[in-house]
Each structure stands twice: as C-alpha cells, then as structure tokens.
C-alpha cells in the first residue's frame, strides 16, 4: 500500500502550475465522485471587454460595461432555493428531473482590477445552467429584461424558450464538497 500523501506528491510533481492536488484521502470502492458530491460551487469571473488583456481573454468573460457586484448579487439572490431550472438549461430529452437547489450566490466587485467574481453553490447543476443564470442576471442588470424576468422563468419553466447565455470564458468548477 502506498500512502495517500505520497500519491499526492507524485501527481503534483507531474502537473503544471495551473492544476494542483490540494487534498487527497482514501475512500471506499463504492465512492463515486459525481454522485456522492453534496455541494458544488462554480466561479464565474468577468469584466468590461475593453479592460481585458490578451493574457486574460481565455480566462475572463468580457461584458459590455462595468457591473456593481452588490446590485448583481441582489438580482441573483432570487435563484436561491429549490426550483425547476428547466428554463436555465440546454435542452436534454433524456433528463427527467430538472429540480435543483441553489444554496448561495455571492458577487464580489474588485475596484482595482474591474473584475466581478460570482460564486454559485448548489446541490447539482444542469447543462449550461450557470452560464444561463449569469446571462439572464446580466440581461436584467443591463435593463434588457424586466426586473422579474428570472422569477417568471423559475415559476413558469419554458424548456424550449430562448436562453440568454453568458460566455464560456471565466466559468470554473471551483469547489466540490462531499
């Protein structure tokens, strides 16, 4: 038997700077990393398009203007709770259950860098759900949709309706709790 700490060190020696194993622990053979997760947290980073450097372009989503994190957070708090998120997913005929629970949403503005960081924690997420949630919230923020647009979509799910999709750059699976 190899100690788990030795496995972690060996893996980290072969990884590059962008990926690193922080913690490792032994689990039973029946453990499933996808289905045994209790909480997932996604991080979405964005800033005004004109302020993104060429080095950031693949890692940060560009948006049309500066955003006040407190106002955006207030808009996004409506997602918290257990809802039918079928209006916030890419169509999937095989999927039977579109009920998901969002535990928390945080939006933080960094005045120095102009970045907005959004953390969304939930039980699990549907395909493209986070990008549609962020895209919809930004549409409300920039007055492209009514203030109650998100609430209407949560109360009256519209599977085939047009989705407002935020850019893929800037989206990260940030943390998984077991």
Provide a role label for each language-model segment.
Residues 1-178:
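Structured-RNA-binding interfaces characteristic of tRNA pseudouridine synthases
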């Amino acid at each position: 038997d190899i100690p788990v700490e030795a496995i972690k060190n060996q893996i980290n020696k072969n990884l590059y700077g962008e990926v690193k194993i922080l913690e490792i622990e032994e689990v039973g053979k029946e453990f499933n990393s996808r289905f045994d997760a209790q909480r997932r947290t996604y991080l979405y980073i964005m800033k005004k398009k004109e302020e993104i450097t060429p080095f950031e372009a693949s890692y940060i989503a560009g948006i049309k203007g500066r955003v006040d994190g407190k106002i955006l957070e207030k808009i996004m708090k409506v997602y918290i709770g257990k809802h039918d998120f079928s209006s916030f997913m890419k169509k999937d005929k095989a999927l039977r259950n579109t009920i998901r629970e969002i535990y928390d949403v945080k939006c933080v503005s960094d005045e120095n860098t102009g970045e907005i960081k959004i953390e969304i924690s939930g039980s699990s997420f549907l395909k493209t759900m986070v990008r549609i949630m962020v895209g919809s919230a930004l549409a409300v923020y920039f007055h492209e949709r009514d203030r109650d647009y998100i609430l209407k979509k949560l109360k009256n799910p519209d599977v085939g309706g047009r989705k407002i999709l935020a850019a893929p750059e800037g989206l990260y699976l940030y943390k998984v709790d077991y």
